């Protein structure tokens, strides 16, 4: 059992409320393996980089990243504001092109007199991911496609797009933005452990609170909060980023709050967990 002494802490026991986390089934060595960056040699988490054109098209985040790239190429750059966001005119055009599951633009914009890039969250996230992946860059007041971004449009390179975006989303980007700063970046530092735990315990419906306790490793800072916000942090930073993956689909549906939109929607075959090097008690 992993971290037996840690689990005896009265605060941890009170938070768990009788739930035994899935990750306690792992040996310490296996737990460490899941905390490795996926590109590491013999990583326990394998990210598929040879998806078909159809599979890529089935992923909203990949599909809309390609739309952003094509627009940047066709328009010879997308105008930016002084703050670095896409111009309102560009955002208005992108609103017509970008579609997202369970995302109602009319509802999302009902209180906005004008629509800026951060107001249209699917576009904002796709732009941030594309820029982090160096598919686009800022040049002379415009967002332009890089040589890498142009090359990813080819059928030969497109199959690796989702692997790049998935890796960046969980292991490079700061997802605390989606949790409105609550609990910092937790539980993103243990993304691999959380994904493995979801894959083994999310076969049946679970409430958000229980699934959070099954899949995450608590931290001391959590217990200083007046209210328990761990389920919200888990939903905002992990489950909504996974919605649409084959082995995580149940977990994502269980955790998603009514009316919320999944921002990272991955193809069904984009990520898998290789359990062969993992051992459990």
Region roles according to the model:
Residues 2-125:
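Short, amphipathic alpha-helical interface elements at domain boundaries
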Residues 32-75, 156-211, 279-281:
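Leucine-rich, amphipathic alpha-helical/linker segments
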Residues 77-78, 136, 207, 248:
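Intrinsically disordered or highly flexible coil/loop and linker segments, enriched in small
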Residues 113, 181, 226:
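Active-site-adjacent structural elements in folded domains
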Residues 117-133, 139, 226-246:
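Short amphipathic alpha-helical interaction segments
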Residues 124-126, 133, 137-176, 249-281:
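Accessory beta->alpha helical hairpin/"wing" motif in late/C-terminal subdomains of nucleic-acid enzymes
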Residues 184-281:
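Elongated scaffolding segments in large macromolecular assemblies
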